[in-house]
Amino acid sequence: MSVDEKVARALKGTTTVGIRSEKAVVLAADKRATAGNFIVHKRVEKIVKISDYMAMTTAGLVADAQVLADVLRMEVKNYELFHKKRMSVKAAATFLSNVLHSARFYPYIVQLLVGGFDTAPRLYSLDWFGTVAEEEFLVTGSGSPMAVGVIEAEYNPNMDLEELVNLAVRAVFAATRRDTASGEGIDVAVIDRNGITMRHYRLGDVIRLVRP
């Protein structure tokens, strides 16, 4: 099987979203894990805490994502211990980009979003070749075509926190309505100057939120 075929199979599942405002970053992801047409797990955590001010969403091969999360978490912690200050989110994304690029001939099959708060909210995307980009909003996974349409139609950088969370949840929910590889509730990470707050929405909670 070629690398392109492996990538296509690995990324056939999951919807993750990242949205940045002037005061916070919101990451959101569904909870379903699939293997082909089979639902393997219904309570997967696709938002990984990297530090007290940084988190990452994962799409792709679970083992690859877990290894990269552990490597990044260790690098951030070592930096903080050695330099006695926080690593910037940009530096963390750049480090992860270098790791991915160094393995480009036998790549980690992942799509990642790294969100955090240093001097301001930051949001970066990374692909399996190490390409890194900073944006106001980003989506990954097989449900991304549906999710990005919701965000593009309604995003405003001046949104307050609850509006931002609501938009992220509705974007992921829209994906779950059309993408069979996404579903089973939504996890949300809110990252601002006070740190990371996790929210967990079951399907009933999501429906009440998007259809008040």
Swiss-Prot record:
The protein's name in its UniProt record: Proteasome subunit beta 2
Gene3D superfamilies, per the entry: Glutamine Phosphoribosylpyrophosphate, subunit 1, domain 1
Activity regulation as described: The formation of the proteasomal ATPase PAN-20S proteasome complex, via the docking of the C-termini of PAN into the intersubunit pockets in the alpha-rings, triggers opening of the gate for substrate entry. Interconversion between the open-gate and close-gate conformations leads to a dynamic regulation of the 20S proteasome proteolysis activity.
The enzyme's E.C. designation: 3.4.25.1
Keyword set includes Protease: yes
Subunit text: The 20S proteasome core is composed of 14 alpha and 14 beta subunits that assemble into four stacked heptameric rings, resulting in a barrel-shaped structure. The two inner rings, each composed of seven catalytic beta subunits, are sandwiched by two outer rings, each composed of seven alpha subunits. The catalytic chamber with the active sites is on the inside of the barrel. Has a gated structure, the ends of the cylinder being occluded by the N-termini of the alpha-subunits. Is capped at one or both ends by the proteasome regulatory ATPase, PAN.
UniProt similarity note: Belongs to the peptidase T1B family.
InterPro entries to which the protein is assigned, alphabetical: Ntn_hydrolases_N, Pept_T1A_Psome_bsu_arc, Pept_T1A_subB, Proteasome_sua/b, Proteasome_suB-type
Propeptide, residue positions: 1-13
Gene source species: Ignicoccus hospitalis (strain KIN4/I / DSM 18386 / JCM 14125)
Keyword set, alphabetical order: Autocatalytic cleavage, Cytoplasm, Hydrolase, Protease, Proteasome, Threonine protease, Zymogen
Annotated localization: Cytoplasm
